[in-house]
From Swiss-Prot:
Entry similarity comment: Belongs to the methyltransferase superfamily. RlmI family.
Keywords, sorted A to Z: Cytoplasm, Methyltransferase, RNA-binding, rRNA processing, S-adenosyl-L-methionine, Transferase
Enzymatic reactions: cytidine(1962) in 23S rRNA + S-adenosyl-L-methionine = 5-methylcytidine(1962) in 23S rRNA + S-adenosyl-L-homocysteine + H(+)
UniProt-recorded name of the protein: Ribosomal RNA large subunit methyltransferase I
GO CC terms of this entry: cytoplasm
EC number(s) stated in the UniProt entry for this protein: 2.1.1.191
Enzyme class: transferase
A GO term, aspect molecular function: rRNA (cytosine) methyltransferase activity
Length: 400
């Protein structure tokens, strides 16, 4: 295979260092010129300023990330066999995890960390939910779907590429059935002994936050005979886990009544005592201040907010938001209580998040001990050359 088969993206002098370290992104500011014409999503070769071959990737002319790398192997073709290999490699790891942990649902493809930039595939039983978030992923849609069908011949595939980031790639939002039957309105899955209902068609992201699986399990270690507050509860995964861990009472708070209704169903589905579960539709910030003013106290608080920051310009505001909400939570905890707090913002580093929690404790006038650290579950791996893949971080904090 020769370079002449593909248009070439030529890097500016000195901008090849990240590629030599096998980082999969090329930003627009590092590009000197294009040699040859390439449509959005098409395969291109990436070379340094002297023409030395570096990688093969997908062209994204509308994005600040001008190209994403498919392969660093000059002899590897980007064809149907390529996508089948990537999916099979990913499935080998997930199948082992599923057998070990008794799972029927997991993230099959985690984008760059599985060698498929812009591709997310979540499995829920026999339903596979597809998100194609880059121009290259969209261009290879047919090959990706074919590879998935070859690996799982009887699967149903549903597209949830209804994510705003596609607009940055010059793509329209997309959602709907791709292969097989429509998923039911609520699909039951199994996670660490829990039965949980997932809304693939209308739920957050692909329907459920699989990345928090291990954190939900860890919650059980802290809640026996405790009063628990579950903030930003969504469909109640943390609440169900807390009840299975023997909590005395759990209050789940969310702004969505639909999500709270599913949370209630999840408690009932697991045969748990519904009298121990309270469901409150409210704004978490406002409710925490109300609880503080009323003198309410809890033994364990789960703080799992949505992403507060989408770009660097929002980071300072997000830091203030994280500090305020964690300060309020710390104020509501009994001495010896535990705060389980998380950030899913990729721009929020673990060190910065830990500093924010420390600052929140100072503002709350309480001492805090960091006793456990969390990250996304093992079906959401982070390849060493792409640290941005570590987006979810969390701490268990003992409040003195």
């Amino acid at each position: 295979m020769t370079d002449s088969l593909f248009p070439r993206l030529v890097l500016a002098k000195g901008r090849e260092k990240s590629l030599l370290r096998r980082h999969p992104w090329i930003f627009s500011g590092g590009v000197a010129r294009m040699e040859g014409k390439a449509r959005s999503g098409e395969t291109i070769d990436i070379v340094d300023h002297q023409g030395k071959w570096l990688a093969r990737g997908a062209y994204s002319p509308s994005s600040q990330i001008r190209a994403r790398v498919w392969t660093f192997d000059r002899n590897e073709a980007i064809d149907s066999a390529f996508f089948e290999r990537r999916l099979q490699q990913a499935q080998t790891w997930r199948a082992w995890l599923a057998e070990r942990d008794g799972l029927d649902s997991y993230r099959l493809i985690a984008g760059e960390s599985d060698g498929l930039p812009g591709v997310t595939i979540d499995r829920f039983g026999n339903f596979f939910v597809l998100q194609l978030l880059s121009a290259g992923a969209e261009y290879q849609r047919a090959a990706i779907i074919s590879a998935l069908q070859n690996l799982f011949p009887d699967c149903a595939i549903y597209d949830r590429s209804d994510v705003a980031v596609r607009k940055k790639e010059g793509l329209e939002l997309a959602q709907g059935p791709v292969v097989g039957e429509l998923p039911p309105a609520l699909l039951p899955i199994t996670e660490h002994g829990m039965k949980l209902l997932v809304d693939i068609q209308g739920g957050h992201k692909t329907g459920y936050y699989l990345d928090q699986r291990d954190s939900r399990l860890a919650t059980r270690r802290y809640v026996a005979d405790k009063r628990v507050l579950n903030c930003f509860s969504y469909t109640g995964g943390f609440a169900v886990s807390a009840l299975m861990g023997g909590c005395r009472q759990v209050t789940s708070v969310d702004t969505s009544q639909e999500a709270l209704d599913v949370a209630r169903q999840n408690v009932e589905l697991n045969g748990l005592d519904l009298s121990k579960a309270e469901f409150v539709r409210d704004d978490v910030f406002k409710l925490l201040r109300k609880y503080r003013d009323q003198g309410e106290k809890f033994d364990v608080i789960v703080m799992d907010p949505p992403k507060f920051v989408e770009n660097k310009s929002q980071l300072m505001g997000a830091c203030r938001g994280y500090k305020d909400i964690n300060m309020l939570a710390i104020q509501l905890l009994n001495p010896g209580g535990v705060l389980l707090t998380f950030s899913c913002s990729g721009l929020m580093t673990t060190d910065l998040f830990q500093k924010i929690i420390a600052d929140a404790a100072i503002d709350a006038g309480r001492d805090v001990q960091f006793i456990e650290q969390f990250r996304q579950a093992a079906d959401h791996p982070v390849i060493a050359t792409y640290p941005e893949g570590l987006y979810l971080k969390g701490f268990a904090c003992r409040v003195m």
